[in-house]
Amino acid sequence: MMRKEGAIFFFELVRLIHVKKPRIVFLENVKNLVGHDHVNTLRIILETLKDEGYQYRYQVLNAMEYGNTPQNRERIYIVGFRDEDDFAKFHFPDPIPLTKTLSDIIDFDKKVDDKYYYTKDKYKGDIYEQLVSEMSEMDAIYQWRRKYVRKNKSGVVPTLTANMGEGGHNVPLVRTYYGIRKLTPHECFNTQGFPESFKLANLSDSRLYKQAGNSVCVEVIHRIAENIVKAIK
């Protein structure tokens, strides 16, 4: 079932589509949309696009397989076309090798602001000691899973979420020469494919983390957009 805030946004989008009748509609959402619990939501979206005169294709793509981005981020992408010829010529991009590594998005050698580090003073009890004991590698990603530490064996960042900056088990952790810390906001944007030169807005860290978690993988969007352009030429 579509959540209230999501439903409001979607039907406002439908209103704009109905009025403007764009040639292309390009949507992105969480992978769970194709799962059993949300199959009715996906059906509503697809039926609405059809009612508005669009033929569509959709596919679940992972950023680390289709965007050369070291993040395990699966999302459903929906592309709708008003023109039948455009629709016939469009296809989603093929998977590509993952050549970027964690070191391309995380500066393990740099000392960052103290606020990002996990220290004994900040984390009382045995949590800090457990992190130190189990986070043995300096080129890996870890997560604190409430009662244990888990290393990401795929060598990529787990899916970034909008509540990552709030702590808890959603925070990817790294160990560097300067200590154990969470990813900085800029590193989170790097993880979404934004360039190192990207300038962050003058916002609180919590809002920046939320923006990064709600963002899209730049390279996946770029590759789909390239195929859309080819289809409508």
Regions found by a protein language model. Give the residues of each.
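C-terminal target-recognition/interaction regions appended to catalytic cores
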Residues: K122-K233
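Class I S-adenosyl-L-methionine
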Residues: M1-T159
